[in-house]
Amino acid sequence: PLSSPHRGSLLTGMYPNKSGIPLNCNSDRPISSLREDVDCVSDVFSNAGYDCAYFGKLHADFPTPNDPQRPGKYVEDRVPAWDAYTPKDRRHGFNYWYAYGTFDEHKNPHYWDTDGKRHDPREWSPLHESGKVVSYLKNEGNVRDPKKPFFIMVGMNPPHSPYRSLDDCMEQDFNLYKDRPLD
């Protein structure tokens, strides 16, 4: 399945033609964006008193020129824009945020935190994201109420085509499959 429609289905429990995301989201496709009027699984947990956290790739919204560091600009200069910043009012109950729209430089990822600050960790994205999730679970920095239950959703980007690229994986993993047909 395509990235955006699949994530829309995971969030809403709906088929892509009902979630608002029939195609991968980019700035040329205003018809493909998570519906504002739908309850997502995160809304249900949040309304039941859970702390809700999202980590990693979301890719469920039509990109708009809303870069927190460059007001009125897209978060990337590529045309069409694929990556997107998700403002608080579009996070469907997630009160802890460490995510991005879509970005395929897995060894040089970026993320926006709950307050819209951009982070550029220069670490392979699955390793970085899993570390952030563990930190959240341990409640390092008191990022959640320890008396409340919590719900975590993680959107890992890799593996992602092209599969014959060291940009998509760590070298030791690449070497395991370098002589096998993956295409």
State each model region's role.
Residues 1-183:
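Formylglycine-dependent sulfatase
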